[in-house]
Amino acid sequence: CSSDLTQKPILDEEGHMILREEYYLDGLNCDPFSFASECQELNSYYHKNKNFNEIKSHHYIISFDPKDRDECGLTGERAQQLGLTFAKKNFPGHQALVCTHTDGHNESGNIHVHIVINSLRKYDIPQEPYMEFDCEAKAGYKHHLSTAYLTHLKQEVIDMCKKKDYIRLICSLLLKEKSQKKNIGHNAGDRKSSMN
């Protein structure tokens, strides 16, 4: 595993990579342990994401305040279920990894859910109101994050948390668009959209 902020591996005192103490991992439309190869197969099938500088995946983070754990009873397992429900509803037809861990950055204790989707849709879905183009609902086309889509995602997170009384949600769904080998976006780093 790696630190969320630096993306550097977490190492033990001997320099060996270690897993986080508590994490949950699921795949949608893929096996979580073969996500990368399954995405590459789909990309090859549709002849997409062949160039180095193309965006291969999108990374969303739903982060909860530590008080949601302490005062509202949020657990890593419950956050994972919320993340899975959110991903199924908001990224249908995409291959996705949903991973939750409970230690937060620098062991802050804030539970957060990572959702990483293949930039290419695997299955056709019904057209959604936030989609700008008809092709966005079709298999083989790339994920397009419009202003309307981002607004929709923000509201979905807020509604999900209000429904469960996680009112202290740190409302920051971060978007990281990554290529396989380097980050692409603003300031030569990750492109992020804050949900505040």
Question: Over which residues does each language-model region extend?
Answer:
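N-terminal nicking endonuclease/strand-transfer module with a His-rich metal-binding environment
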Residues: C1-N196
